[in-house]
A protein has these predicted regions:
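Catalytic loop of the DD-peptidase/beta-lactamase superfamily, centered on the K-T-G motif
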Residues: 10-182
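Hydrophobic, small-residue-rich alpha-helical packing segments that form membrane-like cores
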Residues: 1-9
């Protein structure tokens, strides 16, 4: 069977890519993921979630209450979701609940998005270290085209001059430097 080859950026922020070098993941990351999967695997897992913990062949692996509890907000999320459930990023599109989670390793990215009330799921896999941006675009286009849902627009926030001044400074990342002034 042919396999996709992962790609990473040659330089941070650059447009040139190179084949990602495979590296063994230490056992310490197993709890955080370390899962190798396919689109079919992800959609099978999505159906398991939608069916309340029951497998394709009718075997109950989790109580339905447990699956539903995983979808409940546990903590406010930073900038990647509205909140975080038990293993799930929680969002809302046009008032419709959206749960999802992504994963990444050297040169590969994956994202599973489920809309429980619509009995709908989409899985997107890419062989690029920058694939997560593409995932967002593909999921947004799919939900707009198939379910007629509009992507939530970022809401502006107001900060006092004091709060803005507290954020002023120079921030350094591997791909550049950002200078904020108040």
């Amino acid at each position: 069977y042919p396999n996709a080859v992962g790609h990473t950026q040659r330089t941070p922020g650059g447009d040139e890519h190179e084949v990602a070098r495979l590296y063994p993941l230490p056992r310490s990351v197993n709890a955080a993921g370390a899962i190798i999967s396919t689109v079919d695997d992800l959609l099978t897992f999505a159906q398991f979630q939608l069916d309340g913990g029951v497998t394709r062949d009718g075997q109950r692996l989790l109580p339905e209450e447990t699956v539903r509890a995983m979808w409940q907000p546990q903590i406010k999320a930073a900038n990647f979701a509205d909140s975080y459930g038990i293993g799930w990023e929680l969002h809302s599109w046009d008032g419709v609940r959206v749960i999802g989670h992504g994963g990444t390793t050297n040169g590969f990215n994956a994202r599973l998005t489920i809309l429980p009330e619509r009995q709908y799921a989409i899985a997107v896999l890419t062989n690029s270290g920058r694939g997560s941006a593409m995932h967002e675009e593909v999921v947004a286009a799919d939900l707009q085209a198939r379910l007629r849902l509009e992507e939530p627009k970022p809401q502006p926030i107001s900060l006092s001059p004091e709060a803005l001044a507290a954020l002023a400074g120079v921030y350094k990342r591997p791909d550049g430097v950002i200078t904020l002034t108040a």
